[in-house]
Each structure stands twice: as structure tokens, then as C-alpha cells.
Amino acid sequence: MDRRTLTAIVLSFVLLTAFQFYMAWKYPPAELTGEQVQSGESSAPAPLASTAPVADALPPPVEGMAGSAPQQAMSQPLINTDAKSLLHFKNDLVEGSLSLQGGRLVGMDFLQHTDVLGGKPISFMGISQVESFYQESGFLPVAGSAIKAPDANTQWQLIGKESLQGAGEFKLVWDNGEGIVFEKLFSFAQGSYLFKVEDRLINNSAAALGVYHYSQFKRIPVINSQSMLAMSDFQGPMAYLNGERYQHSYEDLTAQDLREKGHGGWTGFSDKYFLAAMVAKPLPPEAQPRRYYFDYDRPNYRVGMVENSVIIPAGQSLAVDYDLFIGPKEISTLERSNLSLERSIDYGWFHFLAEPLVKVLNFFNSVVHNYGVAIILLTLAIKLLFFPLANKSYRSMNAMKKLQPKIEELKKLHGSDRNKMNEAMMKLYQTHKVNPLGGCLPILVQIPVFFALYKVLFLSVEMRHAPFMLWIPDLSAMDPFYVLPLLMGGSMFLQSKLNPTPSDPMQAKIMMFLPVIFTVMFLSFPSGLVLYWLVNNVLSISQQYYIMKKMEHEPS
């Protein structure tokens, strides 16, 4: 990487980082543009097209802990996790559990992803003394109705087996004793992170019922402060509605509740590598939109959706089904769902470049079966793609270098008159057909590609625990022996020797210390990123040497 490229990237990195800090301080990191409401308030929904209007509210807190401090609430499990109350299911990708108490999904382990390298399967959802993460859904009566509905303590009855493998369906039933039967079906398939949930209400009573359906995630997360490297890594409540992504931090939801409306999309919790999302069936454009909510129901953060209220006549029934995706944010897996789940990966401003880059990276890995080698091949492909631009840049730099003696003469002749000096230099450039910006513009074009690739390597779950070779067991972790950062620093030092020494003494000192600064900074970077930078430097050195040698034999 030549001096101009390095300077441009460093300046761009500093400016982008400073801008992100400013925007995070000045404005929320991302907006939920819906109406802000106070806790406990809700607006009356419009009915489905085929029903009469009835008023309702958002699902109330069901643990009865709304007034408790978070520390008190977390000191004991929120849900009965007794083995007798749990139903277990397993396919080739996940192992999970449902609780008969409350009819909730209370556990989800990813069998192909471990908590640490060589460790046990990562537990993404579950109940513990420190954190909890579960999903629930069902029907609730509209305001003013006295229907006895299932709650957090309801013990559902299982129809069928208590444990399923490969593929299957659990059926839970609860009769309220007043002629109303509630049913819940949870189904899963082999080789999939998608689950289907169907809630049914059978009205065998003598009166019509006014109800609404809700589904929600509740989570008590362990919130860690983010490092500088993870400034752009969003983790928290997220939704994709009406063709737009909405996201908000946990801290923001402690101050205010947020609401949105939409005819289709998904909502849930997004982590760096994993996603839990509820996907409702799309509504027709003429229908009233469903409502989505994001709030802090102490000690839980809640993300959910509420269907429009509906009246069920006596002797009739109602069924509402939706999909759950709970799995890793692998771009190929998300796109196969055809549910726009890939929008949960935020590549930032340069997403239009990052998305094809991650696909090319995955293609190379499918061929060589090693993401480290895939990074090398991708870096080589990018270098080949930009070779014409680099060639133009080096040629422009060489032409400017040849004009340097004449420029010095002009400085001596017109040094005290800036206007005449500029006019003389422009004539000189025109005479020799040299563009003074010719060496910079090709480099500026490459900077977005660099940042896009940075995001790809930093956010891709495919990099998590992916080995390279020898001493690199995990491309998403730092080099345990600092070999790659030291090699990278050495390559930068070699580059500085290939480039001419800057005439400005201060700039010369900065360029001399840059390899040391970057080496120290890269010590804690994921080894996959350091590998990219090292390979890029080696290829740049080779490229620069080749072009300069070729130009030495060309006539001036």
C-alpha cells in the first residue's frame, strides 16, 4: 500500500470514526420513527376488514414483576424450568425446549456453533440466574372483556410425545372451563432454523368473544460496553417493516417505549452473529396494519407484534400462525428464507459493495474449504480488479516526479506571487498532459471497497471460529502469538522504504511511525482482518515494484 493510499485510508478511517461518535452523541444510533408512548398507554387499533371494531391494549406484563428492581427479579428464574414441565426437540441444527407452564419457547441451542472454540453448543435462548430470553404468544381479551385467558402460570396439556427429533410438531391445549379452548401448535423441520407457530381459539361458549393476538420475545440481556472495533456493530431490538429496517439500543428503551405499524415484515432481537425474529403473514394493502412494540417491561426488554382485534361469534374459531427464525446470520441461510431476514446484517453505508463481497468470499470458501485461503483469494481478486486504476495512479505519480525539477524552478521564479505560480504550474501540467489529481482519484475509488470488506470480515458469522492454519485456530479472534500483526507491520515498514521520503520533515516522521502505530493497533484485531491487510500490503508491494520497474524502461 503506497503512501497516498495509506494516508487516504487513515484519514478516511479517522473521519468516519469521528462522524460515528458525533452522530451517536447528537442523535439516536438508528431511529424507530413510530409514535413514542408512555409505558402503559396504547392506541385503539382498527379492526380487520371483516370484523367490527373493538378496543384493546398491548399485552400486559405477565410475570407480575413490573414494580420489582431488575436485581431482585433476576435473583431467581422467571419461569419454571423443572424437567417435568419441559418438552424437548432436536434437529441437525438446533436443540430446544418448550415449557408447559405458559406454553413458551424457553430454550434454543445451536449445535453447529459453540460458545468458545472447541466448547459446547452456544445457548442462545434460555433461563438462567443472570439472563433470560424466551418467546411467547397467544390470545388476550379486549378491554372490558372478562374472558379467562391463559397467562404465565397456566399449565398447558400436551397432546402427543414429550420429545421429538428430526422433524415434528407439539400440540398444547388448555380449556378455561367456560366453553373456550386454546390450542398451540409448534412445528419444526430437519435442516432448518425456521419454526412455525399456530395459535387457535375455539369459542364453544354461548357468546361472541372480542380478542386480539400477540406474539413477543422477552429478554434480560447481559449488556457489555462495546469496544472501538465494535462501534458500528448494532445489538438489540430490531425490525424490518414496510421495506425499512428499524433498530434501537437497549439503553434507549429504558427511557421510552416505541411503536410501529406495518402490513408485513419481521421483528425480534439481533446480536452480532445471531438473530431471533418473528415473521407475520403479510396483510393485504387495504387492511389495517398490525402494530409492533419495543419497550422495557422491567426487568425484560420486549419486542412484539399485535394483530388487529377480532370478534369470534359463538361456535366459531380463530387461528393465527406466524414463523420464527432463530439462528445464525449466515447470508445464504437468511436469503433462502425469502423473508428479508438478510436485512438484519447492517453493513453500513457501503452495503451495496459488502453484500457481493461476502458472496464472493463464501464462493471461494466453498472451493478451498478454508476461510483464510478464501480471504487471500478475495484480496487477490480485488487487487486484479483495481490493477488498471493502480497502474494509472503510479504512472501519474511518476509523471509528477519527473516534473519536480521544473516545479522547483517555477517556485524560485514565482515564489512570492501565488497567482502567477498557480498559472505557471497549470500551463506546465497542460503542456505535459499531467493531471495532478491523477494519483489520488483512483485511490479514493478503492477506499469504499476497503471499508466494505472490513465490515464483511468483522460481521460475518462465517468467520466465527473459522480456522486458518498452523497457529491461527480462529479467524474472528486475535492472533494468539501476534505473528500476523508483526508481519503486517514489517510489510508496512518495507513499503515506506520503497516510497520516496516526504519533503516535509513532519510528514516524514509521521510516515516513519505509522508502521509501529498500526502494528500496536492491529494486535487486538481479529486475525482475519490482519490477514487481509497483510496480504494486501504484500500484493501492493509486488504491484508497485512491477509497475515502477516497467516504467523505468519506458521513454520519458
Swiss-Prot record:
Recorded topology in the membrane: Multi-pass membrane protein
Bias (Low complexity) ranges: 42-55
Locations listed in the record: Cell inner membrane
A Pfam cross-reference name: YidC_periplas
Keyword Hydrolase assigned: no
CDD domains per record: 5TM_YidC_Alb3, EcYidC-like_peri
Lineage: superkingdom: Bacteria
GO biological process: protein insertion into membrane; protein transport
A cellular component annotation (GO) from this entry: plasma membrane
Main location per the UniProt record: membrane
Annotated keywords: Cell inner membrane, Cell membrane, Chaperone, Membrane, Protein transport, Transmembrane, Transmembrane helix, Transport
GO molecular function, one term: membrane insertase activity
Transmembrane portions of the chain: 5-25, 370-390, 441-461, 468-488, 510-530
Subunit structure comment from the entry: Interacts with the Sec translocase complex via SecD. Specifically interacts with transmembrane segments of nascent integral membrane proteins during membrane integration.
Family assignment from sequence similarity: Belongs to the OXA1/ALB3/YidC family. Type 1 subfamily.
Function text: Required for the insertion and/or proper folding and/or complex formation of integral membrane proteins into the membrane. Involved in integration of membrane proteins that insert both dependently and independently of the Sec translocase complex, as well as at least some lipoproteins. Aids folding of multispanning membrane proteins.
Name of the protein in its database record: Membrane protein insertase YidC
The gene coding this protein: yidC
